[in-house]
């Protein structure tokens, strides 16, 4: 069988003494991929992306999976991906990952017509920047996010009277949209450019973060045609088709969906809500490495 590396992190791999509370999502992905890939003569093997002893040439391809610590080791991560790419097929590509790893990619997409939530970009937030952000965005409820990060790590929801927390990293600032609590966040999963499935993610009562770590829940949905069209329009802004993509969106005041994130690095792809995910990925990888 052709071995396919599924890149993980130490804290998501089974048996880790410091395993993350959301590592069950890693297990679900592995369960979804193993059988469909085996039907095409491929064996999916989960590995630690930091394992310097691995010979990447033994794999027919490497898929970035639950590398959920890369933002704390960004340069090492990108360098490792470039080495992997020299030895085998890498999905998604190192260039795409490097571009997508900095939230500035959203500015690039906006120039190509993507509909975004209004955003400020601040390299180091001081008190002056903090206070002016509320005026510039005409909101008393803002969300501050790391420009390199994921999963609400280092994220703050603040008002103008709040104390300024330590934000040592470059930040992006957006108005908090009540729809995240009233309706939820939509995720659309695409494999090799084809729509696979969609879901609605909702936060637990009293919170706004929709990740499972914070008590968020997911429900599979059949998206209305206009919502799906809005998600597909985001993918069309890319020059190349990624193996996998998750488009995270929030409904704006006009009823249309706005892009929150285009996840092309290590997104959880929700195989429970999309039982056909594994087969679609196996077919796509087989075509690409043939």
Identify the residue ranges that each predicted region occupies:
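Active-site nucleotide/adenylate-binding loops and adjacent lid/helix of ATP-dependent enzymes
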Residues: 2-8, 81-87, 94-183, 225-229, ...
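Conserved N-proximal alpha/beta basic substrate-recognition cap immediately N-terminal to
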Residues: 9-120
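Short secondary-structure junctions
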Residues: 42, 114-115, 138, 238-243
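A short, local hydrophobic-aromatic micro-motif
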Residues: 45, 117-118, 174, 245, ...
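Short, solvent-exposed loop/turn elements at beta->coil junctions and helix N-caps
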Residues: 49-53, 147, 175-179, 247-250
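Flexible, active-site-proximal loop/turn residues at the rims of small-molecule/cofactor binding pockets
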Residues: 68, 125, 268
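Phosphate-binding site of ATP-dependent enzymes
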Residues: 151-239, 258
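ATP-dependent carboxylate activation and anion-phosphoryl transfer catalytic cores
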Residues: 225-290
């Amino acid at each position: 069988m052709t071995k396919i590396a599924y890149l993980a992190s130490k804290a998501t791999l089974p048996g880790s003494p410091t395993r993350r509370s959301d590592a069950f999502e890693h297990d679900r992905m592995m369960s979804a991929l193993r059988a469909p890939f085996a039907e095409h003569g491929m064996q999916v093997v989960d590995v630690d992306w930091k394992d310097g002893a691995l010979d990447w040439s033994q794999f027919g391809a490497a898929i970035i999976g639950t590398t959920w610590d890369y933002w704390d080791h960004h340069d090492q991560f990108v360098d490792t991906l470039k080495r992997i790419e020299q030895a085998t097929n890498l999905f998604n590509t190192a260039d795409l990952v490097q571009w997508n790893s900095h939230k500035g990619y959203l500015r690039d997409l906006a120039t190509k017509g993507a509909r975004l939530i209004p955003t400020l970009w601040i390299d180091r937030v001081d008190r002056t920047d903090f206070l002016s952000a509320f005026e510039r965005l005409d909101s008393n409820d803002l969300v501050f996010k790391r420009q390199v990060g994921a999963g609400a790590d280092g994220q703050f929801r603040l008002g103008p009277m709040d104390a300024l927390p330590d934000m040592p990293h470059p930040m992006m600032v957006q108005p908090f949209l009540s729809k995240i609590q009233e309706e939820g966040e939509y995720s659309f999963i695409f494999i090799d450019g084809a729509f696979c499935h969609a879901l609605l993610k909702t936060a637990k009562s009293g919170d706004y973060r929709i990740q499972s770590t914070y008590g968020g829940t997911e429900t599979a949905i059949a998206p209305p045609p206009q919502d799906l069209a809005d998600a597909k329009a985001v993918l069309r802004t890319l020059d190349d088709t990624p193996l996998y993509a998750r488009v995270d969106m929030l409904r704006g005041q006009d009823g249309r969906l706005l892009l929150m994130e285009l996840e092309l690095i290590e997104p959880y792809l929700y195989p429970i809500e999309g039982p056909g995910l594994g087969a679609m990925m196996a077919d796509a990888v087989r075509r690409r490495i043939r």
